[in-house]
């Protein structure tokens, strides 16, 4: 059989019933060993060993915080935002960036309702959006579901009542081409958004699709953006920047839809009672929340809860700065006069984190002018003009009369 395959084959051994291994060479037995001896692998040997324990430590929290501050996902968009006029109509209630340094980004747009000339109103509206491209690409159902929760959570963090929220969804998807796998992406995303709407009793009014499609081998990523809007009074509006040291920082979150909405209701009750000083709807983790809240007034933060995952996404959760102690929310830390974010033993300065955050898109949307030099000053001399103290104008008028 081997010759038919052009292979050389030789018989080198025969399996027997005898429990011995016998080797012969040129008619002489050169080895005759018991199978039991072979099973022992020869004489037993002993040796002392020492294996040092290796520490599989995760990166320090401050190091991870610096990496997040310098990532595109968390980057400051101040250079882009400042290209638009946020004061048109003189009804703006919430500027795009808050705090003394104007560095804590607002998570919602709030403005007074337009009224007739001469009339005034305290009634306004607040609008926010939610979308995580990474989550949508990984799981369109979960990504769309979380987008709805995030948009509504931003309204709640701004002071609105989630029961009064309405939604509008905008979707982008690749060309479907009658391929079930491609059809599955918008199906899963819309199903996730619908489930979130049913859980929150928030209806979506209309929608928009203007960028779907594919070009050659390139597809738009699965995208569903949730826009949420709700009414609120001018005095109910909350901002995102931390206000003072020695304030408790609390987390309002739930693992189920019922727990999450109950947490929102507790937050709203505290806000109406005047106990909420500032708030942030969590998107990319608790660490990002306290970091961006600290930018505005350079108020520091010291973590007190070592169980939480500070960098895990928590769609729907709200971090709030409270002026009084409360027992029906999870306290995660306290504000400090030190200009640093401390997540355990290590910390990072607010100045360093803000610089990293600003630098990501500085080349694309600059916040500083590249020109240098002096600004030319313009001045005009005033002259005295003589005018009569008593006006004695004698106007003449021609009135044509026809009989």
Predicted features, each with a name:
Residues 1-403:
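Glycine/proline-enriched, intrinsically flexible loops and inter-domain linkers
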